[in-house]
């Protein structure tokens, strides 16, 4: 089977979020399972041609390889992509994003023909590639080269929909009749994500629970009705993590490598964090870590609301990340008030991220919603116990630990309010104080695996269903 991945960001070339990790790792996992894979993405200014061995094919396209045989094509345009930033700058989103990604979608399909790569599946990701299913359904339908191609459309985060004024619809190269309720129209505006959902052959998202949630009004994103109308074609497939990058036994970023059989290194990493953040060296106080974007989605409002209760507990808490200025200020204020217990590192630092995963006892992830989440999987890999709200991928990967039967791998609260959150933190601190119980929990954490190979097998089954035309 031959599959083309079309994405606006792909690791290691360009990244703003988790979609880039998926579009870098999943193609390699599919290749290892015998599939022929190509990747198409924009040729942004920040991509280093020399570093990645990128060669020019023609005026609009360059190429390189990753893995053993995954061919990567870069769509070039001197105006659209020769600028800093993928989607915007410090002033906000680029005003021509609709034109930029319309061009990318159209050129991606043209490149397939130019390099004579007749694929079986075109796998599209988020609103930036949402025009591709519509192009294959309408203007290119009569072209024999494209006629048999099927589309899979993955929604990584329903909150980002690609909404533009209706006056820009003529720029899409689509019949005006597609600007309708059953098409791209959304409250008298263009909604690209909606079009991708409607015109693709299959829709996936990044966890089973999130696939259920986006079909309800719970997330208030406005597309629940559209998704319910295609419910038989919507599938949740959990993302994986790279077990070579996130490996406590061989991680070059941490102070001391460790494993479940030789756990002492974990305590050395904890001591390093305590010294670095000028905490008292208290082995009996659990150290909670947070790595992520400082935003509403990640539950920072709830943490701020509960900070006085948390500040009175015997614990330590480290925040690592960047985000909205509002949360920068709130978290710095918390760290100032509880300087012996709370610290903040307001930048994304790869080494420090690995250190927080490795040296923390528990990992704080009270997200309001979380399509998949990778941090909880990474923390388990390092024997660091997640504390999460039951939503999206967190619900699919973390279950409450029961000391009676030894089941579960974290601490979960199911009602999104201060009291439930504080109760979960108290339960985690109490469990940590019981060394026998917590040791058992850490041992269980090391046993969980979320590999890309497992995810890739599910995608192959989905591609095969798509090609067989069986719903």
Predicted feature descriptions by range:
Residues 1-471:
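Catalytic cores of nucleotide-sugar-dependent glycosyltransferases that transfer UDP/GDP/TDP-activated
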